[in-house]
Amino acid sequence: MMVNYREKRRMLIKYGVSLPVAAGLGSLLSVPPARAQPPNDVHKFKISLNVYSFNRLLRAGTIDLFDVLTFCAEHNFDAIDPTGYYFPGYPDVPSDEYVNRFKRQAFLLGLDISGTGVRNDFVQPDPVQRKADVAMVTQWVEAAARLGIPNVRVFAGTHKHEGYSRDQVFEWMAQDIKTCCQHGKEYGVMVAIQNHNDFLKTAADVDRILTMVDSDWLGLNLDIGSYRQGDPYQEIEKNVRHAITWQIKENVWVNGQETPADFVKLFRIIKKAGYRGYLPLETLGEGDPYEKVPRLLENVRQALQQI
Protein backbone atom coordinates (compact mmCIF):
# COMPACT_ATOMS: atom_id res chain seq x y z
CA MET A 1 0.00 0.00 0.00
CA MET A 2 1.32 3.45 -0.90
CA VAL A 3 1.90 5.59 2.22
CA ASN A 4 1.03 9.28 1.94
CA TYR A 5 3.89 10.61 4.05
CA ARG A 6 2.91 14.25 3.58
CA GLU A 7 -0.57 13.61 4.96
CA LYS A 8 0.85 11.45 7.75
CA ARG A 9 3.30 14.16 8.75
CA ARG A 10 0.51 16.74 8.76
CA MET A 11 -1.53 14.59 11.15
CA LEU A 12 1.46 13.95 13.40
CA ILE A 13 2.07 17.66 13.73
CA LYS A 14 -1.61 18.37 14.28
CA TYR A 15 -2.01 15.82 17.03
CA GLY A 16 1.44 16.08 18.53
CA VAL A 17 2.34 12.39 18.09
CA SER A 18 6.01 11.44 17.94
CA LEU A 19 7.25 9.48 14.94
CA PRO A 20 8.29 6.30 16.81
CA VAL A 21 4.94 6.05 18.57
CA ALA A 22 2.94 6.97 15.48
CA ALA A 23 4.52 4.20 13.42
CA GLY A 24 2.47 1.59 15.26
CA LEU A 25 -0.79 3.47 15.64
CA GLY A 26 -2.25 2.84 12.18
CA SER A 27 -5.93 3.65 12.08
CA LEU A 28 -5.86 5.14 15.59
CA LEU A 29 -4.56 8.36 14.02
CA SER A 30 -8.06 8.97 12.71
CA VAL A 31 -9.31 9.48 16.29
CA PRO A 32 -8.38 12.95 17.59
CA PRO A 33 -7.06 13.09 21.15
CA ALA A 34 -8.96 14.97 23.83
CA ARG A 35 -6.57 17.92 23.50
CA ALA A 36 -5.39 18.56 19.94
CA GLN A 37 -3.80 21.91 20.83
CA PRO A 38 -0.98 22.52 23.33
CA PRO A 39 -2.18 23.41 26.84
CA ASN A 40 -1.95 27.03 27.90
CA ASP A 41 0.99 26.38 30.23
CA VAL A 42 3.28 24.92 27.56
CA HIS A 43 6.18 27.35 27.43
CA LYS A 44 9.83 27.59 26.57
CA PHE A 45 12.08 30.37 27.81
CA LYS A 46 15.51 31.19 26.40
CA ILE A 47 17.53 33.85 28.19
CA SER A 48 19.11 36.56 26.06
CA LEU A 49 21.05 39.72 26.90
CA ASN A 50 20.05 43.08 25.52
CA VAL A 51 23.38 44.73 24.75
CA TYR A 52 22.08 48.13 25.94
CA SER A 53 23.11 46.84 29.37
CA PHE A 54 26.68 47.71 28.29
CA ASN A 55 25.70 51.03 26.70
CA ARG A 56 28.20 53.25 28.51
CA LEU A 57 31.19 51.01 27.83
CA LEU A 58 30.18 50.44 24.22
CA ARG A 59 29.67 54.15 23.59
CA ALA A 60 33.05 54.91 25.12
CA GLY A 61 34.74 52.34 22.90
CA THR A 62 36.04 50.49 25.96
CA ILE A 63 34.49 47.27 24.65
CA ASP A 64 32.79 46.16 21.43
CA LEU A 65 30.08 43.68 20.44
CA PHE A 66 32.55 40.81 20.31
CA ASP A 67 33.44 41.43 23.95
CA VAL A 68 29.75 41.20 24.85
CA LEU A 69 29.49 37.94 22.90
CA THR A 70 32.29 36.54 25.07
CA PHE A 71 30.55 37.79 28.23
CA CYS A 72 27.29 36.10 27.20
CA ALA A 73 29.08 32.81 26.57
CA GLU A 74 30.93 32.98 29.90
CA HIS A 75 27.62 33.44 31.74
CA ASN A 76 25.80 30.79 29.72
CA PHE A 77 23.20 33.01 28.10
CA ASP A 78 21.22 31.37 25.32
CA ALA A 79 21.37 34.41 23.08
CA ILE A 80 22.44 38.00 22.56
CA ASP A 81 20.29 40.95 21.44
CA PRO A 82 22.62 43.52 19.83
CA THR A 83 20.90 46.85 19.27
CA GLY A 84 21.75 48.44 15.94
CA TYR A 85 23.42 51.46 17.56
CA TYR A 86 26.44 49.38 18.49
CA PHE A 87 27.26 48.09 15.02
CA PRO A 88 29.97 50.06 13.19
CA GLY A 89 28.58 52.82 10.99
CA TYR A 90 25.05 52.98 12.46
CA PRO A 91 22.53 54.14 11.23
CA ASP A 92 24.02 52.50 8.14
CA VAL A 93 23.86 48.72 8.26
CA PRO A 94 27.06 46.76 8.93
CA SER A 95 29.20 45.44 6.11
CA ASP A 96 28.91 41.86 4.92
CA GLU A 97 32.37 41.20 6.35
CA TYR A 98 31.30 42.37 9.82
CA VAL A 99 27.98 40.51 9.64
CA ASN A 100 29.73 37.27 8.75
CA ARG A 101 32.37 37.62 11.47
CA PHE A 102 29.71 38.36 14.09
CA LYS A 103 27.51 35.43 13.00
CA ARG A 104 30.48 33.09 13.00
CA GLN A 105 31.61 34.10 16.47
CA ALA A 106 28.10 33.84 17.91
CA PHE A 107 27.73 30.37 16.40
CA LEU A 108 31.08 29.18 17.75
CA LEU A 109 30.10 30.41 21.21
CA GLY A 110 26.74 28.63 21.06
CA LEU A 111 24.72 31.85 21.06
CA ASP A 112 21.60 32.72 19.09
CA ILE A 113 21.11 36.31 17.97
CA SER A 114 17.63 36.96 19.29
CA GLY A 115 16.88 40.47 18.06
CA THR A 116 18.14 43.90 17.15
CA GLY A 117 16.69 47.39 17.12
CA VAL A 118 16.88 50.89 15.72
CA ARG A 119 16.12 54.42 16.89
CA ASN A 120 13.17 55.85 14.96
CA ASP A 121 10.33 58.30 15.55
CA PHE A 122 7.01 57.55 13.85
CA VAL A 123 5.29 60.27 15.92
CA GLN A 124 7.18 62.89 13.90
CA PRO A 125 4.62 64.90 11.86
CA ASP A 126 7.07 65.58 9.01
CA PRO A 127 6.38 62.88 6.39
CA VAL A 128 9.85 63.32 4.86
CA GLN A 129 11.55 62.49 8.14
CA ARG A 130 9.20 59.58 8.77
CA LYS A 131 9.90 58.25 5.29
CA ALA A 132 13.61 58.32 6.09
CA ASP A 133 12.96 56.35 9.28
CA VAL A 134 10.88 53.80 7.37
CA ALA A 135 13.75 53.41 4.92
CA MET A 136 16.17 52.90 7.80
CA VAL A 137 13.94 50.23 9.37
CA THR A 138 13.62 48.37 6.08
CA GLN A 139 17.39 48.44 5.62
CA TRP A 140 17.81 46.97 9.10
CA VAL A 141 15.19 44.33 8.30
CA GLU A 142 17.47 43.21 5.49
CA ALA A 143 20.51 43.35 7.76
CA ALA A 144 18.64 41.28 10.35
CA ALA A 145 17.88 38.66 7.72
CA ARG A 146 21.58 38.48 6.86
CA LEU A 147 22.42 38.10 10.54
CA GLY A 148 19.77 35.43 11.06
CA ILE A 149 17.89 37.70 13.48
CA PRO A 150 14.13 37.02 13.73
CA ASN A 151 12.92 40.52 14.66
CA VAL A 152 13.77 44.21 14.50
CA ARG A 153 12.71 46.39 17.41
CA VAL A 154 11.21 49.81 16.67
CA PHE A 155 9.80 52.63 18.78
CA ALA A 156 6.60 54.59 18.41
CA GLY A 157 8.43 57.85 19.07
CA THR A 158 8.75 60.85 21.35
CA HIS A 159 7.90 63.87 19.18
CA LYS A 160 5.42 66.32 20.78
CA HIS A 161 3.34 66.39 17.53
CA GLU A 162 2.15 69.96 18.19
CA GLY A 163 -0.96 70.79 16.19
CA TYR A 164 -1.85 67.15 15.60
CA SER A 165 -4.12 64.91 17.65
CA ARG A 166 -3.20 61.48 18.96
CA ASP A 167 -5.77 60.02 16.57
CA GLN A 168 -3.94 61.58 13.64
CA VAL A 169 -0.60 60.26 14.89
CA PHE A 170 -2.00 56.76 15.27
CA GLU A 171 -3.21 56.87 11.66
CA TRP A 172 0.11 57.80 10.07
CA MET A 173 2.09 55.63 12.47
CA ALA A 174 0.00 52.59 11.53
CA GLN A 175 0.67 53.20 7.84
CA ASP A 176 4.43 53.55 8.40
CA ILE A 177 4.57 50.38 10.49
CA LYS A 178 2.54 48.51 7.87
CA THR A 179 5.18 49.42 5.29
CA CYS A 180 7.90 48.07 7.58
CA CYS A 181 5.92 44.87 8.17
CA GLN A 182 5.42 44.31 4.46
CA HIS A 183 9.18 44.48 4.02
CA GLY A 184 9.64 42.19 7.01
CA LYS A 185 7.36 39.64 5.39
CA GLU A 186 9.55 39.63 2.28
CA TYR A 187 12.66 38.90 4.35
CA GLY A 188 11.19 36.69 7.07
CA VAL A 189 11.83 39.22 9.84
CA MET A 190 9.15 40.39 12.28
CA VAL A 191 8.78 43.97 13.44
CA ALA A 192 8.61 44.28 17.24
CA ILE A 193 7.23 47.59 18.46
CA GLN A 194 8.36 48.46 21.97
CA ASN A 195 6.13 50.02 24.61
CA HIS A 196 8.67 52.59 25.79
CA ASN A 197 6.59 55.03 27.83
CA ASP A 198 6.79 57.38 24.86
CA PHE A 199 3.74 57.77 22.62
CA LEU A 200 2.72 54.27 23.70
CA LYS A 201 2.23 54.46 27.45
CA THR A 202 -0.49 51.95 28.27
CA ALA A 203 -1.69 48.49 27.33
CA ALA A 204 -4.62 50.15 25.57
CA ASP A 205 -2.20 52.15 23.40
CA VAL A 206 -0.38 48.96 22.44
CA ASP A 207 -3.64 47.18 21.62
CA ARG A 208 -4.72 50.09 19.47
CA ILE A 209 -1.64 50.27 17.25
CA LEU A 210 -1.43 46.50 16.77
CA THR A 211 -5.12 46.38 15.83
CA MET A 212 -4.72 49.24 13.36
CA VAL A 213 -1.67 47.71 11.67
CA ASP A 214 -3.26 44.25 11.65
CA SER A 215 -0.20 42.36 10.39
CA ASP A 216 1.04 38.87 11.20
CA TRP A 217 4.53 40.38 10.92
CA LEU A 218 4.06 42.82 13.81
CA GLY A 219 4.39 41.92 17.46
CA LEU A 220 5.26 43.54 20.77
CA ASN A 221 8.66 43.94 22.36
CA LEU A 222 7.18 43.96 25.86
CA ASP A 223 9.22 46.29 28.08
CA ILE A 224 8.25 45.52 31.66
CA GLY A 225 9.75 48.78 32.94
CA SER A 226 7.73 51.10 30.72
CA TYR A 227 4.19 50.69 32.03
CA ARG A 228 4.24 53.56 34.50
CA GLN A 229 0.58 54.14 35.21
CA GLY A 230 -1.25 51.91 37.69
CA ASP A 231 -0.32 48.25 38.13
CA PRO A 232 2.34 47.12 35.62
CA TYR A 233 1.52 43.44 36.08
CA GLN A 234 -2.08 44.06 35.05
CA GLU A 235 -0.85 45.94 31.98
CA ILE A 236 1.53 43.09 31.15
CA GLU A 237 -1.33 40.59 31.42
CA LYS A 238 -3.37 42.67 28.98
CA ASN A 239 -0.56 42.78 26.41
CA VAL A 240 1.24 39.46 26.90
CA ARG A 241 -0.61 37.84 24.00
CA HIS A 242 1.12 40.28 21.64
CA ALA A 243 4.64 39.65 22.96
CA ILE A 244 7.21 38.20 20.57
CA THR A 245 10.21 39.34 22.60
CA TRP A 246 10.87 41.19 25.86
CA GLN A 247 12.94 43.58 27.87
CA ILE A 248 13.20 42.08 31.34
CA LYS A 249 14.49 44.85 33.62
CA GLU A 250 15.42 45.00 37.28
CA ASN A 251 12.58 47.37 38.16
CA VAL A 252 8.97 48.12 37.29
CA TRP A 253 6.86 51.18 38.13
CA VAL A 254 3.94 50.63 40.50
CA ASN A 255 1.62 53.64 40.70
CA GLY A 256 4.44 55.87 39.56
CA GLN A 257 7.04 54.49 41.97
CA GLU A 258 10.08 52.53 40.77
CA THR A 259 10.03 49.14 42.49
CA PRO A 260 12.11 45.94 42.18
CA ALA A 261 10.39 43.56 39.77
CA ASP A 262 8.63 40.51 41.20
CA PHE A 263 10.09 38.01 38.75
CA VAL A 264 8.14 35.03 40.06
CA LYS A 265 4.88 36.89 39.53
CA LEU A 266 6.04 38.10 36.12
CA PHE A 267 7.18 34.71 34.84
CA ARG A 268 3.97 33.06 36.01
CA ILE A 269 2.05 35.55 33.87
CA ILE A 270 4.30 34.81 30.89
CA LYS A 271 4.10 31.06 31.44
CA LYS A 272 0.31 31.11 31.76
CA ALA A 273 0.11 32.88 28.40
CA GLY A 274 2.01 30.00 26.77
CA TYR A 275 4.82 32.25 25.57
CA ARG A 276 7.67 30.43 23.87
CA GLY A 277 10.81 32.33 23.03
CA TYR A 278 13.49 34.69 24.20
CA LEU A 279 13.53 36.70 27.41
CA PRO A 280 16.19 39.38 26.85
CA LEU A 281 17.50 40.93 30.07
CA GLU A 282 18.44 44.61 30.27
CA THR A 283 20.06 46.54 33.11
CA LEU A 284 19.82 50.33 33.31
CA GLY A 285 21.37 53.20 35.22
CA GLU A 286 24.62 53.61 37.07
CA GLY A 287 26.90 50.78 38.09
CA ASP A 288 29.19 48.22 36.54
CA PRO A 289 27.35 45.97 34.06
CA TYR A 290 29.91 43.24 34.75
CA GLU A 291 28.38 43.12 38.23
CA LYS A 292 24.79 44.16 37.52
CA VAL A 293 24.06 41.76 34.67
CA PRO A 294 25.19 38.58 36.51
CA ARG A 295 23.12 39.66 39.51
CA LEU A 296 20.01 40.17 37.38
CA LEU A 297 20.67 36.88 35.58
CA GLU A 298 20.90 34.99 38.87
CA ASN A 299 17.67 36.57 40.16
CA VAL A 300 15.91 35.60 36.93
CA ARG A 301 17.19 32.03 37.05
CA GLN A 302 16.12 31.62 40.67
CA ALA A 303 12.65 32.94 39.86
CA LEU A 304 12.27 30.60 36.90
CA GLN A 305 12.92 27.65 39.22
CA GLN A 306 9.87 28.67 41.26
CA ILE A 307 7.28 28.70 38.51
Summary of predicted features, one role per range:
Residues 16-26, 37-41, 99-115, 120-219, ...:
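Active-site acidic/histidine proton-transfer and metal-coordination neighborhood
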Residues 82-102, 157-160:
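Glycine-rich, proline-tolerant flexible connector loops at the mouths of alpha/beta enzymes
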Residues 81, 115-117, 153, 247, ...:
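Conserved beta-strand positions in the central sheet of alpha/beta enzyme cores
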Residues 80, 106, 255-256:
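Asp-box/BNR beta-propeller blade signature and adjacent active/binding-site loops
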Residues 84, 122-123, 159-161, 249-255:
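Conserved radical SAM core fold
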Residues 90-99, 127-130, 290-292:
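Metal-dependent catalytic neighborhoods of phosphoester/phosphodiester hydrolases
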Residues 2-28, 32-76, 200-307:
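Histidine-acidic metal/acid-base catalytic patches
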Residues 82, 122, 195, 222-224, ...:
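Generic detector of well-ordered alpha-helical packing
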